[in-house]
Amino acid sequence: MGPRYGGAPALLLPLLLLLQVSSGLCQEPEPCRPGFGADSYTFTVPRRHLERGRVLGRVSFEGCTGLPRTAYVSDDTRFKVGTDGVITVKRPLQLHKPEISFLVHAWDSSRRKLSTRVRLKAATHHHHHHHDAPSKTQTEVLTFPSSQHGLRRQKRDWVIPPISCPENEKGPFPKNLVQIKSNRDKEIKVFYSITGQGADAPPVGVFIIERETGWLKVTEPLDREQIAKYILYSHAVSSNGNAVEDPMEIVITVTDQNDNKPEFTQAVFQGSVTEGALPGTSVMQVTATDADDDVNTYNAAIAYSILTQDPLLPSSMMFTINKDTGVISVLTTGLDREGVPMYTLVVQAADLQGEGLTTTATAVITVTDINDNPPIFNPTTYQGRVPENKANVEIAVLKVTDADVPDTPAWRAVYTILNNNNDQFVVTTDPVTNDGILKTTKGLDFEDKQQYVLYVTVVNVTPFEVILSTSTATVTVDVEDVNEAPIFIPCPKVVSIPEDFGVGQEITSYTAEDPDTYMEQRITYRIWRDAAGWLEVNPESGAIFTRAELDREDFEHVKNSTYEALIIAIDNGSPVATGTGTLLLVLSDVNDNGPIPEPRNMDFCQKNPQPHVINIIDPDLPPNTSPFTAELTHGASVNWTIEYNDPARESLILKPKKTLELGDYKINLKLTDNQNKDQVTTLDVFVCDCEGVVNSCKRTAPYAEAGLQVPAILGILGGILALLILILLLLLFVRRRRVVKEPLLPPEDDTRDNVYYYDEEGGGEEDQDFDLSQLHRGLDARPEVTRNDVAPTLLSVPQYRPRPANPDEIGNFIDENLKAADTDPTAPPYDSLLVFDYEGSGSEAASLSSLNSSESDQDQDYDYLNEWGNRFKKLADMYGGGEDD
């Protein structure tokens, strides 16, 4: 055989193969053809109920745009197609037919629309699909894909189908799943191993493989709710450890068993429905979930049902529930909140579409109120009284009853006045009692109408759900007459007069009318406000007179040539009512003011003085103002000159004619207005020692012009102040030297039996500060008292204790000296002339012994004492009757 293929023919075969490959490589690529990968796609779904978000399948499209993604549009809004071609369910739906179809559209690079049809088929339901799968009659073997060039990665398109393993199997374990073989196991000894989740990654050891035979086994029961899919990698190596095959991916899917019952999302569901709801009205929805597989099995296909209803009124089946969605709706009519306000339902959820595991929950349905009961007045007639001219006065409280639920729109009352043409009344609703409060919105006029009859209806905030009649109440309102204030007509009253209107003249008559036509009342008038004091009013007639001169230029009281005064009118009703009227006097201008310059004080520099602008002001109105005429008078034109600054002659320019001496200058300026009203004004101008514009100017004091300097003035003032201080000190010294003389005799109105004078009528001495020097002087410096009718007896003089230095010993001092005085042998008897130790020093009055009118011992006549009054009656009795004895 070898020689047969030798030589030239043998070399020609590789050349032909090379040419064939080269020709294939040189061929131009086929043009891109846009379109879907198939004309139609069919996807099988395991159940008729499809939840939101479920993935149905995938379509492919080549748009020849070079973009990795494509925009798809489904003509069935229940499905959504993503840019990757994956079709998902947009909202929950139920397949009522075994098969449905729809179109999916896409556009190519030329904006041409292309379509494909997608069909959905429901899988056939087997009642015992949840039981364990029957044992296989033939062993399943997985073989590594063949490789022509040794070890290389397997093709991306080559996928090993997943291996199914039921959950919750009973064993025995380990249990064979599948046998893995290599195509080279007949050539060399191959050893097998696995890696991945469940093998060498947590949970470790769930799956094992026999090293030599390649049997993949499960070692324990699986739980789909924990891990639904395992991904393992099988490896084949030779005895020396070299890889014989590329690693192969093995997917183990845990098939579901119905081992979880449904669970409601809530133990108690709350819902509500209005009374009188029609059958088919949706009330609420209950939901339950199931942890089992809801894609490939019916273990999580939940069906809902109602087990019980409480109460069974008015029917035992008032509600129904959708088996698939759990929506509870009204089944029959007859819902009445006033009869049954609440229903309690026990609902059940069962998987396997109602044939499997079950659970229950409670649904509480509240029957809400509707406006099927009208508000009714009770009573229907009312009477009220209101004084006239008063707004927002409560007239009556309208009572209503309503059988609907309180504090709801079906209970809240709304009142309407049928014959309220002028909107004089309003009815508001009390938020607590629901009563209607009838009030006035504006003042009523008794003279216009004395009684009103109102018709009031009542409804609710929400309209009636059924045809109902409305309730009506009748309210009679009587208007009470009250004393109303007089009304000035017109108000305000405008009167135009000249400002030089004569004093005492009548300006106008401003009177008021009494609206109380049924009362004959007398009205008097007074001035209420007259800020300038220009007016007076006749209290009976209301005539307005001037009592002072008017002045339009009194800008404090006159605004825009108008003077405002308030006049009041007072009636004699009970109570007294007062009305106010406004009188506006428009004062026309009179040329009674001469023009004046502004400013009047100015400073000029002596050198190169800057002229000053003087504005001319006239408070009068045109034509009594500009143009003005200016003139310098009293010799002011010798040093100064003026000229007009503007054509209207409303300002002047003042400047000196020559260089002036420093000092004050008085300039007399005569200004005349357009109507020849003139006025002379003196300008005070000071010439400063400066040049050009005056920045600062020091004015010389008046005394400086008299030749007196500031130091001299201060010296004179200081001398006067020193002289005043010296005189004040002398006066204080003289007052301190003056001795206060004590009175010798008591006051004339003090009559006593002896000559002792204590200056007190009882109660003790208030002043406890004793003048101890007087006591000492009274004992040691007694005055000399001589008698000329008795020869003195020479006796020893008692020794008196000197005044102590310590004031605390004053008591002992007085007691000892008193005892010495009592034992004094020189003391005269009580019936003779007493010699007092002390009667006051420096007294200008003589001693009592000076009463003798003669130096002889002859008897004296004392009868004249009786003529001296009661003060000398005691002396007259003592001396006047001596001869009778």
From Swiss-Prot:
Keyword Amino-acid biosynthesis: no
Required for binding CTNND1 and PSEN1 as annotated region, ranges: 761-772
In-chain residues carrying the UniProt-annotated modification Phosphotyrosine: 756-758
A GO CC term attached to the entry: cytoplasm
Gene Ontology terms describing biological process: adherens junction organization; calcium-dependent cell-cell adhesion via plasma membrane cell adhesion molecules; cell migration; cell morphogenesis; cell-cell adhesion mediated by cadherin; cell-cell junction assembly; desmosome assembly; homophilic cell adhesion via plasma membrane adhesion molecules
Site note Cleavage, residues: 753-754
GO molecular function, one term: calcium ion binding
Binding site for Ca(2+) 2: 259
Residue ranges of the region described as Required for binding alpha, beta and gamma catenins: 814-885
Stored PROSITE patterns: CADHERIN_1 (PS00232), CADHERIN_2 (PS50268)
Domain Cadherin: residue ranges: 158-264, 265-377, 378-488, 489-597, 607-688
Post-translational changes noted in the entry: During apoptosis or with calcium influx, cleaved by a membrane-bound metalloproteinase (ADAM10), PS1/gamma-secretase and caspase-3. Processing by the metalloproteinase, induced by calcium influx, causes disruption of cell-cell adhesion and the subsequent release of beta-catenin into the cytoplasm. The residual membrane-tethered cleavage product is rapidly degraded via an intracellular proteolytic pathway. Cleavage by caspase-3 releases the cytoplasmic tail resulting in disintegration of the actin microfilament system. N-glycosylation at Asn-639 is essential for expression, folding and trafficking. Addition of bisecting N-acetylglucosamine by MGAT3 modulates its cell membrane location.
Basic residues: compositionally biased ranges: 121-131
Ligand binding (Ca(2+) 3): 290
Protein's cellular compartments: Cell junction, Adherens junction; Cell membrane; Endosome; Golgi apparatus, trans-Golgi network
Modified sites of kind Phosphoserine: 773, 796, 841, 843, 849
Membrane topology: Single-pass type I membrane protein
Acidic residues: compositionally biased ranges: 758-770
Primary site of residence: other
Cytoplasmic compartment residues: 734-885
Entry function: Cadherins are calcium-dependent cell adhesion proteins. They preferentially interact with themselves in a homophilic manner in connecting cells; cadherins may thus contribute to the sorting of heterogeneous cell types. CDH1 is involved in mechanisms regulating cell-cell adhesions, mobility and proliferation of epithelial cells. Promotes organization of radial actin fiber structure and cellular response to contractile forces, via its interaction with AMOTL2 which facilitates anchoring of radial actin fibers to CDH1 junction complexes at the cell membrane.
Subunit structure: Homodimer; disulfide-linked. Component of an E-cadherin/ catenin adhesion complex composed of at least E-cadherin/CDH1, beta-catenin/CTNNB1 or gamma-catenin/JUP, and potentially alpha-catenin/CTNNA1; the complex is located to adherens junctions. Found in a complex composed of CDH1, RAP1A and PKP3; PKP3 acts as a scaffold protein within the complex, the complex is required for CDH1 localization to mature desmosome cell junctions. Interacts with the TRPV4 and CTNNB1 complex. Interacts with CTNND1.
Official protein name in the record: Cadherin-1
Organism classification: Eukaryota, Metazoa, Chordata, Craniata, Vertebrata
